């Protein structure tokens, strides 16, 4: 059976994703298929967002043509949704199997702090509105192996990004006076994180993840509900996704970058037990794996106990 390398870029607009795609194209001897390039080619406007259905139909078709011709290829788009990543990965694997071709799937996660994405975006010829970057940031799913990847590559365009948010202890100290303004929390944000961490002391990666599991709250804090109505309590919609992305830039000290990705994944899922309640363990053990679910539940129990 022949083997074809398929690479999917994952990153926010302005993260340096397309520049990275060119680098990996040389490394893997692969063709790059970019959603922005297709928009420019077909609609003469790389910023066009009115024909996404047509753009991605063309992109997917070209990926499959490369696979059928046994060519390595790179999918260059933001690809922020884990569900869509998984669905397309299954789709091309099924397609390749009909051609007696095996897919070696790699995910390139371009790790750039959102504030740099916004800054770099302003330097581009084709700029993405800042509110679009903000929306994508709040909906970003950090990639992980349960999606079906053979390998995930963490690509930091600037080496210093790896620990530019400092240590978990520094975040806790800086938020000891952060009033959460929510009836579910009697403690400040820093106090809550410290108390939750005490509940999982000695748990290694789980302890690290617990110490910053709510780090996305300051960014997401709003006194408006989902209808846009002003409320007396503060809401933190999507803080688990923002927090998971932020974890990639904390100093993980003795942990490797891929262990840090695991911690980010724990933060990504730590709210799910609240949403799924008694169905969480059974449903998500099949979806993301038993070990990951058990570690998420450790954070959940610590989170509840620290309210």
Indicate where each model-derived feature is located:
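Conserved beta-strand scaffold positions in the cores of enzyme catalytic domains, especially
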Residues: 30-32, 105-107, 151-155
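Glycine-rich phosphate-binding loop used to anchor ATP phosphates in small-molecule kinases
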Residues: 51-105
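Conserved substrate/cofactor phosphate-moiety recognition/catalytic segment
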Residues: 19-71
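Active-site flanking loop/helix segments enriched in acidic
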Residues: 168-197, 218, 222-232
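Conserved phosphate-donor/acceptor-positioning beta-strand/loop module used by diverse small-molecule
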Residues: 101-117
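Divalent metal-dependent catalytic cores for phosphoryl transfer on phosphate-bearing substrates
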Residues: 196-306
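Conserved GTP-binding G-domain of TRAFAC-class P-loop NTPases and closely related GTPase folds
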Residues: 6-10, 15, 23, 115-165
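Pre-Walker A (Motif I) flank of P-loop NTPase domains
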Residues: 2-7, 70-71
């Amino acid at each position: 059976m022949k083997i074809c390398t398929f690479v999917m870029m994952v990153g926010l607009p302005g993260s340096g994703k397309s520049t990275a795609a060119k680098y990996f194209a040389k490394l893997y001897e692969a063709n790059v298929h970019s959603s922005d390039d297709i928009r420019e080619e077909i609609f003469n406007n790389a910023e066009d967002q009115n024909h996404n259905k047509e753009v991605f139909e063309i992109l997917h078709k070209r990926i499959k043509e490369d696979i059928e011709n046994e060519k390595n290829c790179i999918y260059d788009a933001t690809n922020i949704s884990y569900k869509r990543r998984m669905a397309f990965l299954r789709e091309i694997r099924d397609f390749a199997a009909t051609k007696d071709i095996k897919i070696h799937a790699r995910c390139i996660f371009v790790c750039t702090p959102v504030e740099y994405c916004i800054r770099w975006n302003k330097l581009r010829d084709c700029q993405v509105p800042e509110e679009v970057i903000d929306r994508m940031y709040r909906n970003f799913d950090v990639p992980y192996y349960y999606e079906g990847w053979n390998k995930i590559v963490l690509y930091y365009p600037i080496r210093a990004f790896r620990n530019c948010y400092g240590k978990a202890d520094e975040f806790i100290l800086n938020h000891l006076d952060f009033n959460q303004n929510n009836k579910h929390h009697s403690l400040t944000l820093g106090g809550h994180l410290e108390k939750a961490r005490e509940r999982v002391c000695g748990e290694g990666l789980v302890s690290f993840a617990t110490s910053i599991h709510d780090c996305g709250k300051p960014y997401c804090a709003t006194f408006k509900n989902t209808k846009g109505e002003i409320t007396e309590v503060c809401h933190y919609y999507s803080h688990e996704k923002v927090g998971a992305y932020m974890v990639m830039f904390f100093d993980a000290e003795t942990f490797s970058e891929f262990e840090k990705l695991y911690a980010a994944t724990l933060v990504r899922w730590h709210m799910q037990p609240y949403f799924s309640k008694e169905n969480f363990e059974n449903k998500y053990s099949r979806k993301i794996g038993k070990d990951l679910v058990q570690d998420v539940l450790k954070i959940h129990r610590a989170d509840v106990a620290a309210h």
